[in-house]
Every structure is written in C-alpha cells, then in structure tokens.
UniProtKB/Swiss-Prot annotation:
<feature type="transmembrane region" description="Helical">
    <location>
        <begin position="605"/>
        <end position="625"/>
    </location>
</feature>
<keyword id="KW-1133">Transmembrane helix</keyword>
<keyword id="KW-0150">Chloroplast</keyword>
<dbReference type="InterPro" id="IPR002128">
    <property type="entry name" value="NADH_UbQ_OxRdtase_chlpt_su5_C"/>
</dbReference>
<dbReference type="InterPro" id="IPR003945">
    <property type="entry name" value="NU5C-like"/>
</dbReference>
<feature type="transmembrane region" description="Helical">
    <location>
        <begin position="9"/>
        <end position="29"/>
    </location>
</feature>
<feature type="transmembrane region" description="Helical">
    <location>
        <begin position="425"/>
        <end position="445"/>
    </location>
</feature>
<keyword id="KW-0521">NADP</keyword>
<dbReference type="Pfam" id="PF00361">
    <property type="entry name" value="Proton_antipo_M"/>
</dbReference>
<dbReference type="GO" id="GO:0048038">
    <property type="term" value="F:quinone binding"/>
</dbReference>
<feature type="transmembrane region" description="Helical">
    <location>
        <begin position="283"/>
        <end position="303"/>
    </location>
</feature>
<feature type="transmembrane region" description="Helical">
    <location>
        <begin position="224"/>
        <end position="244"/>
    </location>
</feature>
<comment type="subunit">
    <text>NDH is composed of at least 16 different subunits, 5 of which are encoded in the nucleus.</text>
</comment>
<dbReference type="InterPro" id="IPR001750">
    <property type="entry name" value="ND/Mrp_TM"/>
</dbReference>
<keyword id="KW-0793">Thylakoid</keyword>
<dbReference type="GO" id="GO:0009535">
    <property type="term" value="C:chloroplast thylakoid membrane"/>
</dbReference>
<protein>
    <recommendedName>
        <fullName>NAD(P)H-quinone oxidoreductase subunit 5, chloroplastic</fullName>
        <ecNumber>7.1.1.-</ecNumber>
    </recommendedName>
</protein>
Length: 739
C-alpha cells in the first residue's frame, strides 16, 4: 500500500508534459508538428490512462478502509507562518479521480475524430490536458490555498475552452461572461478562505476542522462572522456549479466544441463547486443556518433549471439547463446532510450527462453534413427529426441516457435521484414536493428533446418546405392559436416577442438560407473521412466517436449498482457505503445500516410514476403528427375548443415567454448591473476628467500665468520696476486712507 501511495504525486502533474511539448513543438517545428498533429492525441490518452490506473488502485485501498495524507513540502515564511503543499487522498478524492479520468479519456478519444478537421486541433488537446491537470490538482489538494490556486486554473481553462472558437463573436462573449460571472464567486471564495484563516490560523483541512469544531463547542467565535465566511465560501461553489443566481454563464458556455461541453458538465468545472461543498461539509454542518442556505439554493436551482429547459431549441442548451437542475439535486442533498446520496448522484449524473453530450455531438456532426457549419441550424432541434433512421447507434445511446436522466429503472440516475427524493421527505415536505414535481418536468423536457431530434421526419428535407401548399394540418403543438397552418419554406421558429398569443410555435417566420453550405469562415469541412464523399443526408459517426458512447452506455447501465444496498443476509455488496465510510448523514443519525426494500419500492413507484407521466405528456405533445396521423382527430378536438382556450393560451404564453427569456434574469442583470455599472463608470470618468483633472490642471494653468506675470515684471526693464513701485505705493496709500 505504501508502495502505491509514494507515487501519488504524479496524479495531478502526469499530463503536464502534453501541453508543454505541444507549445514547444509549435514554436520550433510548426510545420512538422501540424503535419502529424493527430499523433498528439495518443500521449494525452496514455498519460491520463496511467492516472486512471492509479486512481482505481487508490479507490480499492479506500474501500478496504485506508486513508492517506501525504506531506510533500513546506514553505516557511517566518517562525509563525509556514505553508504546506500536500496531497489528501480520501474517499471523496478517489471518487473524483475516477470520474475525471474515465470521462476525460473517453472525451479525448471522441475528440480525436470530432476535432480532426479543425485548425485548432493541437490547441484543443493542449487546453483539454491542462484542464484535466487543473481538476486533478484541485481534488487532491490538502488545504484551502491549494484549492484556490487550482480553482483559478480551472476557471482559466474554462475561459479558454468555452472561447475556443474565439473568432465567432458569440463564443468570445460567452467565455467572457463565464469568466466574469465566476470572478464574483472567486472573490467570495477568497474572502471566505481569509476569514477562516483569521478564525483558526490554519489552511490545512485537518487542522481547520479540528480547531473550528473546538471553537464552536466552546462558543469562542462570533456566529454572525462565521456564517458570513461560510456563505462567502459557498458563493464560490454557487458560481462554479452554476447554481442560482450565478447560473447565467452555463447556457452560453455551449458555444464551445461539444466535447468541451461534455467534459465541463460531467467531470470538471461544474463538478468543482460540488466538490468544494462536499470537502467543506464537516465545516458547514456545525455552522447555524448555512446548511439551510445550501439546501434552499439547491431546490431553487432544481426548479429553475427544469423550467428554463422547457422551451430550448438548441439541443446543447437544453442539456445545459438539465445539468443545472441535476446539480441542484446534488446541492440539495448536501444541504440536507445526505452526503452519500449527493456523491452517488454526482457519479451517476456524470456518466449519463457525458453520454448525452457526446450523443448530441454525434447528432450535430451528422446534421453538419446537410446544413454545414452553422450552430444555429446544426444544433436546432426544430430542424431535426427522423434521425433514428440515419444514426441508429447514436439514437440508442441517447435514448438510454435520456431514460437514465428521467429516473427510469434500472438505469443509473434512478437509484441516486430516488435516494435524494426519499431523503427530502425527511427534511422538508415542501422541498420534497418540488423535487418530485421537477422529476416529472425532467422527464418531460428530456423526452421533448429526444422526440424533436429522432422521431418523425427530417424537417429540413420535408417536401412541405418547397413552398407548395400541400399541408393544412394544425400545429404540432397544442398551445398555438386555432386554425390551420400551411408549412412553407419559411420555417416557423419560436420567438421571444409574441403579441398574438401564440405559444411554443409562433407564426413569425425566419427564412432559411438557400445555400446552407456556403460558409464565410468554415471551421470544419463536412465530408466522410474515408472517401471524401459529401453527404446529402445525415450519417452515423465514425467508430472512434461511437466507441465512447458504447462505453458510457455500459456505465449508465451498471454504475448505479455500486450504490444499491444488497446487504441482505450474507451479501454485503453496497460498495458506495463502504467507500464513503465514515459518511455524514444528518437525516439518518440513528440508522443501523439496514435497508427497508418495501419502503424503497413504495417510494420508487411514486417517483417513477411521475417520470412516466412527464414522458406521456411529452409524447402526446411532441410526437410528430406526420408519423402518427391516427391521433390527429383528437388533437384537432383540443385545438377547436374555441373561446375556452383564450385564457389557457395566455397562461401558457406567459410561461413560455418567461422560460424562453431565461426567467428574465439575464435581462435583470443587464439592466440592474451592467447598465448601472456603465452609468457609474461614466460618472466616475466625468468626475475624474472634469473635477480631479480640472483641479490639477487649474493649479498648473494658474501657476503658469502667475509665472508669466512675474517673468514679465522681472524682465530687467527700469520702466517696469518703476511701474510696479508706484502701483504698490498707490495700493498701500488707498488702504491707509480707507482705514
């Protein structure tokens, strides 16, 4: 065991040679390096695989009951202060290491083909390797200073990855938005770290927890100050994990390449905030009110993320809001003190969401063979449909990932989400009702995404788009105005400004380009990689893009089994419970580790029924009528309800506009913060230029004229001296006369 632990130092730095060598090679041998650029994927995968092997070995040691803290080096500032750099390997670290390495390897393999035609291929792999380095360093940190250093590096990597295609203005704006939003959280994190150092005098987790618990027990610390410092630490996690109200950067982060989205949402950036709260949970549990704040932010984020996902047309943005909502479940579990359930859902959600994002990348890849490189079209679910005939493997993988996220047994997310919902009933019935309702919303919008993408016909190629008036069917959404809809070449898209009462599909139209393959700046040439044949229809991705999907399907099927309590009789296969021993659980303090299968099945039936209800509603509303005309009469009977629908239309229209406009939160920030700061900046600039500079320049000008006057008088001319003498005498004489 000691032989294994002495090599743990290589974990955070094993990948460091990759970005360094890529940079050096591009400087000294640019042409040769670019000619063999795909060779650089191999060392990235190889080194990360080595780290993965170490991670699994360490995890086995953790399951067997070991914990390790390895001291590395110490930097002594003076006799009273020294800073220690170290590695902390415990159950939380080993879980995060496995998540980062397994998902990271699959994303790198996937990216080799996905980015093969991009001019920034080498830069992409350098950024990805550096991002993995930062995250590995973060989860192995033994103190708050190391956490903050790698925390900032994770933020820098996210800035570089989100803005990878920086020549696109929307991508450049997205990375700036993510960076600025996270600056708010990072500032709070730094203040919180300094506050707890002022209280305890230590950055090390072991000493920090021990000293702080003693101070709380002896009532030797100011409660308000402690709550403030803990809240500031939590603000850092709120920003990094896209929790309300600092979630606004997450949907815009989808402007980066899809493999980046998979990595950020599954194993790196958004997981960093969850990791921070989990790492500091022994600190938070003894602070009044802070756990309530964490759970409150979690439940708000759950509901907000689910409602904002309802109207998304972009497939990646829909998955982004799904991530936001699912991270809310994890934050809720941490706030309730259900440590095991939180980490369980972190594991299952990571693999399911990686599967969905890589699946969406395969979908986008296939759509680009028709519409060219145009994210507004290749990622638009309204322009998809019927893809199950063209990408059957991707369809199956995406379908299983969708079922998992919906909480359908026996897939992974069912076990973890159900555990969180069951614990929420013990914590707060109101929170439990919201969590259960959101589970139904999750099933609704995820199946909406699936149906719009794979069912029906490929909308871009429908004959009805030729302009012929051949269709008089009603809108496929029941929430539009009464009347027939003729489908023309101008495709009906959702709009923000909807004054006519239309809902999910407005009659305001936006013409599609006649030649969608002409691109001003093509990043990717859409051809089949083997025979250079251009496709006029979607096609399945290559094998090295499908292989990670199949592996993630296996994870989605079986990773949930690590948390299923099989401890019946002589069986003791609850791996996660042994992995997390000792575990924090404020809701089951008197538990004897027994498991009531009857209670579990009863609660599961309720949650699964809600999920199936959401799936049914989604299927009823979004299953295309072009492929299921037998339901057309029923649909038209709802559409023709006449005046009874007016109030319902208004309600749905308000909900739709609220969801489509992201709850008006971005608009509020734009008005209340951005414009206010701009006005304050302009006033400050005016005050600086006119008042501060005016005083300084006024003194200079006055001195200049006084000096010029003195210089003129003292020019050596007798007449000037005589004039000054007589003028002075006259002044004194007048003053004397007045007095």
């Amino acid at each position: 065991m000691e032989h294994t632990y002495q090599y743990t130092l290589i974990i955070p730095f094993a990948l460091l040679p990759v970005p360094m060598l890529i940079g050096v090679a591009l400087i000294f041998f640019p042409t040769a390096t670019k000619n063999v650029r795909r060779m650089w994927a191999f060392p990235s995968v190889l080194l990360l695989s080595i780290v993965m092997i170490f991670s699994f070995n360490l995890s086995i040691q953790q399951i067997n009951g070991s914990s390790i803290y390895q001291y590395v080096c110490s930097w002594t500032i003076n006799n009273d202060f020294s800073f220690e750099f170290g590695l902390l390997i415990d159950s939380l670290t080993s879980i995060m290491l496995i998540l980062i390495t397994t998902v990271g390897i699959l994303v790198l393999i996937y990216s080799d083909n996905y980015m093969s035609h991009d001019q920034g291929y080498l830069r992409f792999f350098a950024y990805m390797s550096f991002s993995n380095i930062s995250m590995l360093g973060l989860v192995t940190s033994s103190n708050l200073i190391q956490i903050h250093i790698f925390w900032e590096l994770v933020g820098v990597c996210s800035y570089l990855l989100i803005g990878f295609w920086f020549t696109r203005p929307i991508a450049a704006n997205a990375c700036q938005k993510a960076f600025v939003t996270n600056r708010v959280g990072d500032f709070g994190l730094l203040l919180g770290i300094l506050g707890f150092y002022w209280i305890t005098g230590s950055f090390e987790f072991r000493d920090l927890f021990e000293i702080f618990n003693n101070l709380i027990y002896n009532n030797q610390v100011n409660s308000l100050f402690v709550i403030l410092c803990a809240s500031l630490l939590f603000v850092g996690a709120v920003a990094k994990s896209a929790q309300f109200p600092l979630h606004v950067w997450l949907p815009d982060a989808m402007e980066g390449p899809t493999p980046i989205s998979a990595l950020i949402h599954a194993a790196t950036m958004v997981a960093a905030g969850i990791f921070l709260v989990a790492r500091l949970l022994p600190l938070f549990t003894v602070i009044p009110y802070i756990m309530n704040i964490i759970s409150l932010i979690g439940i708000i984020t759950i509901l907000l993320g689910a409602t904002l996902a309802l109207t998304q047309k972009d497939i990646k943005r829909s998955l982004a809001y799904s991530t936001m909502s699912q991270l809310g479940y994890i934050m809720l579990a941490l706030g309730m003190g259900s440590y095991r359930a939180a980490l369980f859902h972190l594991i299952t959600h990571a693999y399911s969401k990686a599967l969905l994002f890589l699946g969406s990348g395969s979908i986008i890849h296939s759509m680009e063979s028709i519409v060219g490189y145009s994210p507004d079209k290749s990622q638009n679910m309204i322009l998809m449909g019927g893809l199950k005939k063209y990408v059957p493997i991707t369809k199956t993988a995406f379908f299983l990932g969708t079922l998992s996220l919906c909480g359908i047994p026996p897939l992974a997310c069912f076990w973890s989400k159900d555990e969180i919902i069951n614990d929420s009933w013990l914590y707060s019935p109101i929170f439990a009702i919201i969590a259960c309702s959101t589970a139904g919303l999750t099933a609704f919008y995820m199946f909406r995404t699936y149906l719009l993408t794979f069912e029906g016909h490929l909308n871009v190629n429908l004959k009805n788009y030729s302009g012929k008036k051949t269709s008089s069917f009603y809108s496929i959404c029941l929430w539009g105005k009464e009347g027939s809809k003729t489908i023309k070449k101008n495709y009906c898209l959702s709009t923000i400004n909807n004054n006519e009462g239309d809902s999910f599909f407005s009659k305001n139209t936006y013409p599609m380009d006649g030649n969608v393959r002409n691109m001003t700046r093509p990043f990717i040439t859409i051809t089949h990689f083997d025979n250079k044949e251009t496709f006029s229809y979607p096609h399945e991705s290559d094998n090295n893009m499908l292989f990670p999907l199949l592996v993630l399907v296996l994870f989605t099927f079986f990773v949930g089994s690590i948390g299923i309590p099989f401890d019946q009789g002589r069986m003791d296969l609850d791996i996660l419970s042994k992995w997390l021993t000792p575990s924090i659980n404020l809701l089951h303090t008197n538990s004897n580790n027994s498991f009531d299968w009857y209670e579990f099945v009863k609660n599961s039936i309720f949650s699964v029924s809600i999920a199936y209800f959401g799936i049914f509603i989604s299927s009823f509303l979004y299953r295309p009528i072009y492929s299921s005309l037998q339901n057309l009469e029923l649909i038209n009977s709802f559409v023709k309800m006449g005046p009874k629908r007016s109030l319902w239309d208004k309600i749905i229209n308000v909900i739709y506009n609220w969801s489509y406009n992201r709850g008006y939160i971005d608009f509020f920030y734009s008005i209340a913060l951005t414009r206010s700061i701009r006005v304050i900046s302009e006033l400050t600039h005016f005050f600086d230029r006119r008042v501060i500079d005016g005083i300084t320049n006024g003194v200079g000008v006055t001195s200049f004229f006084v000096g010029e006057g003195v210089r003129y008088v003292g020019s050596g001319r007798i007449s000037s001296y005589l004039f000054l003498y007589l003028f002075s005498v006259s002044i004194f004489f007048l003053i004397f006369q007045v007095l």
